Amino acid sequence: MVSGSCINVLKKEDLSGRKVLTDYVLKSVTDNYSEEINEDGEIKAKIVSAPNTEKRLIKGSLASASVVAGLAFNKFVSGTPLYRQEQELKRRGVPISRASMSNWMMRCSDDYLKPLYELMKKDIRSCEHIHMDETTVTVLEEKAERTGKNYMWLMCSGKWEEQQMAIYCYHKNREHAFAKEMIGEDYSGKIHCDGYEAYEKFEKATPLGCMAHFRRYVYEAYELDAGSKIKNRTELQEYAKTHEAFGILNHILSEVKYLFECESKYIKDKLTPEEIYTKRQDEQKERLEGLFVYLDEHQTHFTKQSKAGKAIQYGLNQKEKLMNYLNDGEAEISNNRAERSVKPFVMGRKAWLFSNTISGAESSSIYYSLIESAKMNGLDIEAYLTYILSLIHI
């Protein structure tokens, strides 16, 4: 038994908190008023309703800006297809069909987001540096018409551009004409790409190659020639003495590695474009010129159809474009910037697999453009989508 005199009441309270995740329905209440009531208590005038000033995001729909933003975030960022979102919402007591979700997202992209998307496309064409890439996408409506492979094209602004954005555009194929349609036929800036011929058709623009692509092709050949089996530098040197082809590939990779190490140091030292230009002229130009001389002298050591032969030929064919970055401190040595921006689409494609319709693919291109641009600017993606949908639909 505890005596009451032994109990001391502590005046300071211990507070604890928990975060609770919950769904809710925001209801609007409309007040009704009568203008006049007679002596018998009857309404003489008709009922007057207070105006409901809230404008629906989609007429006749319960969808709000945050709901559509959440659906888009789950699909395009988290990689959750609509059928799985439908299952999860049903489990939580919110039965919404995937058809409704799809309709909401497409309506919002067409009615509210597309004008913003078109402005972004216009703005990115004013950038001095752009990066381009393309990747396949399956569109069932196109497949039924046998149009061949369908493509999602990507255009993103250069590292030093004031406006940081990524623009996705769907097109039924990879035809050269669409590159001009997307970028603008009169574009006169710098186009970073992977060697695709479509980007060489611009009379006023300067194409820049991708050293990372060249390195990858050489490394694939290097791996075939026992590269993956060699454990240390000593083994490598011994193997190279007795395998001339391997030694050639190893030398090429070493030279390219040096170039990338220089670029990494410039980033680490936070150099300005002007300083980068000077450093490249002093540290890289002679080495890169020497590398192309080496490629030319040793290309006959490989058959044209071998991986090594194709890799070396790629480098020689791309020589001018691969060297162009030396002439501009804002240019990049590779097109990795575009590849990083297109990767979220590639990863998402593994989850949702295909688009049913052309309009669905075009809608996806709009959402991906806004989402990846938000990422590039350090924004909260879901909050950003909610904000612009709330703002634009008013």
Each model region followed by its residue ranges:
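Helix-rich, typically C-terminal accessory recognition domains appended to large enzymatic cores
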Residues: 295-338, 346, 350-351, 357-384, ...
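Basic, short loop/linker segments at the boundary and entry of helix-turn-helix/winged-helix-like folds
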Residues: 2-78, 90-99, 106
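Short helix/loop capping segments that flank catalytic or ligand/cofactor-binding pockets
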Residues: 10-11, 41, 48-51, 139-141, ...
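Gly/Pro-rich turn-and-neighbor structural signature
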Residues: 83-181, 186, 266-326, 330
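Short amphipathic alpha-helical "interface-anchor" segments enriched in bulky aromatics
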Residues: 196, 200, 211, 215-219, ...
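Conserved small/polar residues in nucleotide/adenosyl-binding loops
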Residues: 392-394
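Conserved beta-strand -> loop -> alpha-helix junction used to position metal-binding or nucleic-acid-contacting
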Residues: 195, 203-241
